[in-house]
Regions:
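Nucleotidyltransferase catalytic core that binds NTPs
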Residues: 2-147
Length: 147
């Protein structure tokens, strides 16, 4: 009977997260459908909703703080999943933060018109150190269409 090394007992736990990112400015009932899709894709796992900080009078009338407040009031069932993180400015900030929080697999739910763009952009920098920071998700970041 041989002794096993400690390493043979270690198994790295897979920790998955599904997320969405958008302007949501102003929030609409259509956004609730997107949030429903994010939850569905997560299959009971963790999911998060991030809003961009875009703010201009014409296309993005609400500032970030007000937008988060409205999103949480309009969609109370998702209030805990709507992230009001002031440090998030880009999609790279999101994936770096998720990786730093210990997630090993990530899925982004995006509009059908942006799936290819996000898939290419995010996976180009998976496991690459750079100005954007560092993240390394197993198999890259999966990007699925919101429908």
């Amino acid at each position: 009977m041989g002794f096993k090394s400690f390493g043979e007992y270690l198994t790295e736990e897979t920790k998955e997260v599904t997320f969405g990112w958008g302007r949501y400015n102003p929030p609409t009932s259509g956004h609730e459908k997107l949030f429903d899709t994010i939850k569905k894709v997560a299959r009971g796992g963790q999911f998060r909703i991030y809003a961009s900080k875009s703010n201009d009078p014409k296309k993005n009338p609400l500032n970030f703080k007000t937008k988060i407040k409205f999103l949480r009031k309009m969609f109370p069932k998702y209030a805990r999943n709507i992230m009001g993180d002031n440090d998030i400015r880009t999609i790279f900030d999101i994936v770096v933060k998720l990786y730093d929080q210990g997630f090993t697999k990530a899925t982004l739910v995006a509009g059908s018109d942006r799936v290819t763009e996000f898939e290419t952009l995010l996976n180009k920098y998976n496991n690459v150190e750079g100005r954007h920071g560092f993240y390394n998700f197993e198999g890259g970041i999966r990007v699925v269409s919101a429908g």
